[in-house]
Swiss-Prot record:
Listed InterPro entries: 4Fe4S_Fe-S-bd, 4Fe4S_Fe_S_CS, DmrX, Flavin_trans-like, Flavoprotein
Record lineage: Archaea, Methanobacteriati, Methanobacteriota, Stenosarchaea group, Methanomicrobia
Cofactor: [4Fe-4S] cluster
Catalytic activity as recorded in UniProt: 5,6,7,8-tetrahydromethanopterin + A = 7,8-dihydromethanopterin + AH2
Organism: Methanosarcina mazei (strain ATCC BAA-159 / DSM 3647 / Goe1 / Go1 / JCM 11833 / OCM 88) (Methanosarcina frisia)
Pathway: Cofactor biosynthesis; 5,6,7,8-tetrahydromethanopterin biosynthesis
Protein known as: Dihydromethanopterin reductase (acceptor)
Recorded superkingdom: Archaea
Stored SUPFAM superfamilies: Homo-oligomeric flavin-containing Cys decarboxylases, HFCD
Protein role: Involved in the biosynthesis of tetrahydromethanopterin, a coenzyme used in methanogenesis. Catalyzes the reduction of dihydromethanopterin (H(2)MPT) to tetrahydromethanopterin (H(4)MPT). Ferredoxin may serve as an electron donor.
Pfam families found in the cross-reference section: Fer4, Flavoprotein
């Protein structure tokens, strides 16, 4: 396939998020002329910050025409920019990672968010859509954002991670460190490096895929104009 102008839809999943970013980074390295227009759901705006990827998106979408970053919080309820899919502006739309919520909406034709609107308009505009669901079958190993392991935490009155967090994302309660506010966290990792007891962690957790999510993936597989891929890396095989 020959794709030169593509759109990337990101939804609010931590699983597959960094791998998706690495795939698009690789595509840009292979072909600097490739234009990538990024559509970010409201939940993805938060999750990108948690995983330290928010500022890195400019390496994929630098800001020129068809290389903008469209955030749902800035696009309003009507998502006017998705009209580009009807105007022959894109060769393909890739949605990765796609949460179970997004997949269920696609399965039943609901288009009430920036990314699901993009999918709907892409299909109507005969633009090929490729979806990478995070919940396909069985169980998955998902990467979690930074959190405090309370078994390891010593509840120090003087807490280097809390005192040095540049985003003031670590709260205290009754004079000791309490928890990380993930809506403030930028995923920089400074806190993890500063904790002398290795109490701040982020890493793999096994998560069960629900039956309903697997059924919705099967429905999406049968839909006109949409192809389901099992991993972000499968996108590389299309170029």
């Amino acid at each position: 396939m020959s794709f030169q102008r593509i759109a990337w839809g990101i939804t609010g999943a931590g699983h597959f998020l960094d791998r998706s970013y690495q795939v698009f980074k690789e595509l840009k390295l292979r072909n600097p002329e490739l234009s990538v227009n990024t559509y970010v759901s409201r939940a993805a705006e938060e999750v990108l910050r948690m995983y330290g990827l928010e500022q890195k998106l400019v390496k994929i979408s630098g800001g020129d025409y068809l290389e903008e970053i469209f955030r749902e919080s800035e696009q309003g309820s009507s998502s006017p920019k998705v009209g580009r899919f009807a105007l022959d502006r894109y060769d393909a739309l890739f949605v990765t990672p796609a949460t179970s919520n997004t997949v269920s909406k696609i399965a039943y034709g609901i288009a009430d968010s920036l990314v699901t609107n993009a999918v709907s308009q892409a299909v109507k505009g005969r633009v090929p859509v490729f979806v990478v669901p995070v919940d396909i079958e069985g169980s998955i190993i998902s990467e979690m954002p930074y959190n405090i392991d309370r078994k390891q935490c010593k509840h120090c009155e003087t807490c280097p991670p809390r005192e040095n967090c540049p985003h003031e994302a670590i709260s205290e309660k009754n004079g000791v460190t309490d928890q990380i506010d993930l809506l403030k966290c930028k995923g920089c990792g400074i806190c993890k490096e500063l904790c002398p007891y290795n109490a701040i962690k982020g890493g793999p957790v096994e998560v069960l895929v629900r039956d309903v999510d697997m059924r919705n993936v099967e429905i999406v597989k049968s839909l006109q104009g949409i192809t389901v891929l099992e991993s972000p890396e499968a996108i590389l095989e299309l170029f």
